[in-house]
């Protein structure tokens, strides 16, 4: 019997073995489930082979303890972490906080050693209970937005407490150590007020730099959401509102380049122009752009809403290496395939640890809008980072059980359905045929074939040249 699986095929069905150390960190948002029609996004829409790390946004905090935020989070956790059965190399993290979460609960939690210990203990229990591989701290921001100046040092202490506890728990439990990351701002004011960069970088596994939202409808003139460099005419504070300045700042303050993950947006920031005849960068604007048909948020448009604009004019900001479009009195600064390629080239030159994406649900994830296939922006990152790539659409075959018709021409012989009994989920060689392999998932046995000319290697759990 042929079994069709969403985003069929396992990550290991590759033309080359896994060897790149680059990370591709992708955020999943638990509110995208409420969008209408084709834009609704759930864990089933995720490609388990697309990103190296998936981060679930967001968890909350109750009485200094990690907690859910949506009515169905526990169900979504199960589906989200179940993706690791299809890609055993995938790592999943849970993010706590976010912009709308505010700062008060973080401030209260870090205020005393007892409160921090309560949080740390709850985090370990919560992550293990729901099968996450780590925690992502998204406090926006210590020392700002109502958070007192003392929270700068207290955030450092929190990071140290979590890192120490994660290490101790791994030694006690015998399990792989939980990962610890943080989403951090690009703006110098926020960084100076809230982060002892060299100290937290020692204890974080990686640092997700939110290199976007440099400009938006909160300003009175148009500007790009995520420019790579400054414009020639910019000086002073304005000259620091770009990706390059943010990266240099975090590196100079002590972040190892290999730990710094460059954030990239799959959305644009939109404006309503004061005059439809003045469409330049820096043109006067009266406020946020018109809400998109799916995201329904003024001043922000998903890539799948931007790419399908009819009658719009697209131009590139040569100094900043990014595009914008305009139509009538609407103006949007966004990223496209070309700008993502340029940014990956940049991060490689800087020796950074990889790319981060906000967010999965804002790319054209189903290929319904841009005529560029599924996940055109994130697939571009994957390819440019030289991560092994599995084309979607490869069918997964369930091994026939006794009495079932043997539709897969080269399926295992009847009786091998017991192969996975007592085995951990994962990939195993087919002793009868090197060009195929077995996969065990929740006690079920599946067989897949390598591409023509390749054989399965048990050492890398991948298809490679003979």
Curated annotation (Swiss-Prot):
Residues 1-21 form the signal peptide. It catalyses: Random endo-hydrolysis of N-acetyl-beta-D-glucosaminide (1->4)-beta-linkages in chitin and chitodextrins. Residues 417-466 form the Chitin-binding type-2 domain. Residues 22-388 form the GH18 domain. The active site is at residue 140. Glycans are attached at residue 100. Residues 392-424 are annotated as: Disordered. Detected in spleen. Secreted by cultured macrophages. Chitin binds at residues 70-71, 97-100, 141, 210-213, 358. GO terms for biological process: chitin catabolic process; immune response; polysaccharide catabolic process; polysaccharide digestion; response to bacterium. Disulfide bonds join 26-51, 307-370, 450-463. Transmembrane segments: none annotated. GO terms for cellular component: extracellular region; extracellular space; lysosome; specific granule lumen; tertiary granule lumen. Keywords: Carbohydrate metabolism, Chitin degradation, Chitin-binding, Disulfide bond, Glycoprotein, Glycosidase, Hydrolase, Lysosome, Polysaccharide degradation, Secreted, Signal. Changing residue 74 to K: Rare variant detected in patients with Gaucher disease type 1. InterPro entries: Chitin-bd_dom, Chitin-bd_dom_sf, Chitinase_II/V-like_cat, Chitinase_insertion_sf, Glyco_hydro18_cat, Glyco_hydro_18_chit_AS, Glycoside_hydrolase_SF, Glycosyl_Hydrlase_18. It holds the Pfam family Glyco_hydro_18. It is found in: Secreted; Lysosome. GO terms for molecular function: chitin binding; chitinase activity; endochitinase activity; hydrolase activity, hydrolyzing O-glycosyl compounds. Its EC number is 3.2.1.14. Degrades chitin, chitotriose and chitobiose. May participate in the defense against nematodes and other pathogens. Isoform 3 has no enzymatic activity. Belongs to the glycosyl hydrolase 18 family. Chitinase class II subfamily. Monomer. This is Chitotriosidase-1. It comes from Homo sapiens. The lineage of its organism: Eukaryota, Metazoa, Chordata, Craniata, Vertebrata.
């Amino acid at each position: 019997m042929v079994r069709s699986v969403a985003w069929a095929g396992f990550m290991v069905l590759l033309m080359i073995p896994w060897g790149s150390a680059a990370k591709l960190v992708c955020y999943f948002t638990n509110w995208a489930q409420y969008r209408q029609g084709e834009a609704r996004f759930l864990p089933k829409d995720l490609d388990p082979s697309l990103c190296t790390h998936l981060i679930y946004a967001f968890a909350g905090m109750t009485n200094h303890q990690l907690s859910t935020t949506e009515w169905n989070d526990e169900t979504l956790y199960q589906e989200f972490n179940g993706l690791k059965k299809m890609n055993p190399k995938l790592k999943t993290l849970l993010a706590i906080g976010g912009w709308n979460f505010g700062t008060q609960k973080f401030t209260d939690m870090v205020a005393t050693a007892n409160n921090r210990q309560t949080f740390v203990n709850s985090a370990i229990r919560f992550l293990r209970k729901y099968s996450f591989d780590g925690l992502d701290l998204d406090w926006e921001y210590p020392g700002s937005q109502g958070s007192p100046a003392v929270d700068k040092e207290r955030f450092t202490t929190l990071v140290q407490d979590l890192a120490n506890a994660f290490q101790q728990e791994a030694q006690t439990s015998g399990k792989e150590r939980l990962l610890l990351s943080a989403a951090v701002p690009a703006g110098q004011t926020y960084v100076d007020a809230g982060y002892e960069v060299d100290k937290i970088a020692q204890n974080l596994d990686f640092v997700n730099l939110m290199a976007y939202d440099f400009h938006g409808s909160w300003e009175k003139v148009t500007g790009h959401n995520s420019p790579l460099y400054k414009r020639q005419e910019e000086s002073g504070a304005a000259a620091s509102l770009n990706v390059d300045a943010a990266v240099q700042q975090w590196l100079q303050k002590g972040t190892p380049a290999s730990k710094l993950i460059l954030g990239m947006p799959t959305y644009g920031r939109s404006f309503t122009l004061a005059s439809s005849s003045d469409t330049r960068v820096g043109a006067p604007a009266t406020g946020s752009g018109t809400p998109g048909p799916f995201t329904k948020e003024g001043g922000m448009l998903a890539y799948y809403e931007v790419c399908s604009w009819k009658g719009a004019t697209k131009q590139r900001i040569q100094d900043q290496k990014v595009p914008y479009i305009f139509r009538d009195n609407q103006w949007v600064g966004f990223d496209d395939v070309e700008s993502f390629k340029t940014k990956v080239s940049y991060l490689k030159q800087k020796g950074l640890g990889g790319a981060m994406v906000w967010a999965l649900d804002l790319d054209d994830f189903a290929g319904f809008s841009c005529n560029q296939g599924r996940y055109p922006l994130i697939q571009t990152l994957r390819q440019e980072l030289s991560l092994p790539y599995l084309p979607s659409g490869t069918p997964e075959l369930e091994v026939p059980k006794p009495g079932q018709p043997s539709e897969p021409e080269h399926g295992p012989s009847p009786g091998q359905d017991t192969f996975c009994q007592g085995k951990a989920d994962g990939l195993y060689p087919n002793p009868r045929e090197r060009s195929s392999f077995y996969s065990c998932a929740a006690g079920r046995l599946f067989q897949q074939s390598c591409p023509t000319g390749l054989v399965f290697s048990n050492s890398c759990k991948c298809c490679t040249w003979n």
